[in-house]
Every structure is written in C-alpha cells, then in structure tokens.
C-alpha cells in the first residue's frame, strides 16, 4: 500500500500546480469570434450594429454614415441576387499579432446556392474590444 501511496502523494502537488495554472486567452480566437458576430448582425439586417463594430464608426460624418448603411443594404441585396443570399458565416481561422494588437479573421460565407467564399476581416483591439479595421 505504501508503494502505491508514496508516488501518488509525491505527484499530487505537481498535478495540482499544473491544473491550477491560468489558461491564456487566445486573442486571435476572440478577434475571430467578434468578426463572426459582426457579420451575423449584418445578415440579420442589423446594419447599425454592424457599423458599430467598425473601429472608426463614431467619428463618421452623418452623410458618410448614411452612405455606408446604404452600401451595406446593397451588398446584402447583391448577395441575394448572385448567390441566393448568405445563409451563414463561420470562422475558419484567425491570426493574432501581439506586436500591434491586430488580428486577421478568416471567415467563410456559406451561400444559399451551396457555394462558400473565404473573406479576411482585419481586426484591431481598442480599449479591450475587438473592432473591424
């Protein structure tokens, strides 16, 4: 019995230390999830919310903001005509650059005509929030 207990008691502190370490947050994954969320808002017709995910959106003049919202609506309509719309968006991968707190999120658009397209969404972290660049 001592032969079994001694190695277990010896290893127990090391196992506890290994299990209690804080896991680092994958910033690339967080940026990718944020990009996916923004595009899901776009698909739901929440154009203001999508535009709110842009890094520079609060500094836009009203006339330019209105034009961007119009362009977003036109983009969705164009996708409906060309591909029977975008059914869903998924995160393929992401790459994080710690040097300048930026990331590239690689999203897949799954179209209604059963085709897919990969798009790259450049992201930047501002005040702890991932925003589109």
Stretches with model-predicted labels:
Residues 11, 35, 103-105:
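Small side chains
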Residues 4, 24-28, 96:
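Generic alpha-helix initiation/capping and coil-helix boundary signal
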Residues 32-37, 47-98:
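Short solvent-exposed beta->alpha transition segments
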Residues 88-133:
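Exposed beta-sheet edge and beta->alpha loop/turn motif
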Residues 18-44:
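Short, low-complexity N-terminal intrinsically disordered segments enriched in polar/charged residues
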Residues 1-19:
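Sec-dependent bacterial lipoprotein signal peptides
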């Amino acid at each position: 019995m001592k032969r079994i207990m001694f190695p277990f008691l010896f290893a127990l502190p090391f196992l506890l230390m290994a299990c209690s370490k804080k896991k680092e947050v994958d910033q690339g994954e967080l940026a990718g999830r944020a990009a996916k969320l923004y595009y899901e808002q776009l698909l739901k017709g929440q154009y203001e919310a999508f535009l709110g995910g842009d890094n520079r959106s609060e500094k836009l003049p009203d006339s330019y903001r209105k034009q961007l919202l119009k362009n977003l609506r036109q983009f969705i309509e164009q996708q409906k005509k060309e591909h029977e719309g975008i059914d869903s968006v998924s995160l393929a991968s992401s790459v994080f650059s710690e040097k300048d707190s930026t990331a590239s999120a690689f999203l897949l658009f799954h179209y209604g005509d059963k085709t897919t397209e990969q798009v790259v969404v450049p992201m930047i972290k501002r005040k702890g929030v991932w925003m589109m660049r």
